[in-house]
């Protein structure tokens, strides 16, 4: 018995010594950082069970208060990196004591200038040395772009790339073994950033997990401006109310839900969904015209679900996929301008903070498209550099996305295939795309859409349930994901059912014999 107590005591002492050594290493780490254009604010030791400090996070990004309790021991490094005489970005590097030899960079969202702390918490728990930047400015607004192309360049690509270079250097300094593999995790603008790295800096990452990417970014901004032109303001005869959009949604589900073989309230393949809205036009005897559509309103809805073309007839951006209208009615169809599109035109295209979004026309679309600063559109179809570097990319997009249509991801996949002359099986060697039914914008919707892309969608560490772990397995073991399994969560966080989401261009089909909640009752066809 005495021997067991002695062993336990020795183990406890070793753990204490290890923590003390790690704490000391962290507290003195700033003395070792001598990187060009880098100013270190602090290196802070964060023990298990402590509140994670966000001391440099401004109120516009949520402020300095944090309700996150650290489940790991890590060294939190805060610093600024100068990119020009008119621009700089803030970044943090989290260096965990449970380090696995993996480096990971996180992305941003919207016109976001806020560090993705949620993703940093998620990745560092897995032992990744993790970084996040503010992408060149603080806050979720484009006003910092006004008359400052250097800040736009940081936002387009430079902050992520430079932050990755700095982050890798810090990782090598802190850990004697350096890093074995580098990864990226991001969604929305973060998805675009991941793809920009693939296109422009193919050696930055071995594995990229990119969700709902803001591909074709400038025309995405044009697309966001176009909806006000289609719907008109709330007092116009073309406007469709949120209550009517609910009716429209029910009609879309009625027409399209069963196309995949199961009636479950979720559309598995939006390409098959081509709804006819004339079924909702009020008849001549209708008393309550708010429960149906006028002919003019039906035309509005048809336009909403149509692709955007330029003045010269050139395709600019795909349609909004059906199934997203309940959320989109408050984002795009509310009779107001879309904030991100509004900011892009005010502070980038025209450098005029008084520009009125209600004046937008296809001529403005042409001006913005021609400008495309620093190729921010991120629509290059040749990713052969990434292929040759041995990189892998797992691309996903929710089929209920109400901010960035999933048709944009399908268009990009086809663009890559056409540009590189590769078949789906050829692309599978390094690029796999998974449309996720029942997923909204980077987050769950009506279906089995928790796929482990972040803490809020955690569904286990098994690679089939976790896109980050699936990428690690692909890069390090050569086992590529054949499907992504999503979980449908109840309000209390319990798993109601799971579904395997197919690798594009295959689609999910219910074949039975079990219920639609049985993951084995579905087949990729």
From Swiss-Prot:
Q: List the disulfide bonds.
A: 26-75, 61-114, 187-442, 256-273, 282-292, 502-524
Task: Look up the EC number in the record and give it.
Answer: 3.1.1.73
**Single GO molecular function:** metal ion binding
Q: Which Gene3D superfamilies match?
A: alpha/beta hydrolase
What name has this protein been given in UniProt? Probable feruloyl esterase B-1
Q: Where does Ca(2+) bind?
A: 257, 260, 262, 264
Output one GO BP term: xylan catabolic process
Phylogenetic placement of the source organism = Eukaryota, Fungi, Dikarya, Ascomycota, Pezizomycotina
Query: Which residues, renumbered to this chain, are glycosylated?
Result: 51, 80, 98, 283, 288, 351
According to its UniProt entry, the function of this protein is described as:
Involved in degradation of plant cell walls. Hydrolyzes the feruloyl-arabinose ester bond in arabinoxylans as well as the feruloyl-galactose and feruloyl-arabinose ester bonds in pectin.
Which transformation does this protein catalyse, written as a reaction? Answer: feruloyl-polysaccharide + H2O = ferulate + polysaccharide
InterPro entries in the cross-refs: AB_hydrolase_fold, Tannase/feruloyl_esterase
Q: Tell me which UniProt keywords the record has, alphabetically.
A: Calcium, Carbohydrate metabolism, Disulfide bond, Glycoprotein, Hydrolase, Metal-binding, Polysaccharide degradation, Secreted, Serine esterase, Signal, Xylan degradation
Q: Which residues form the active site?
A: 188 (acyl-ester intermediate), 401 (charge relay system), 441 (charge relay system)
Any one GO CC term of this protein is: extracellular region
Signal peptide annotation: 1-20
Family note: Belongs to the tannase family.
Task: Tell me the compartments it is located in.
Answer: Secreted
Q: What class of enzyme is it?
A: hydrolase
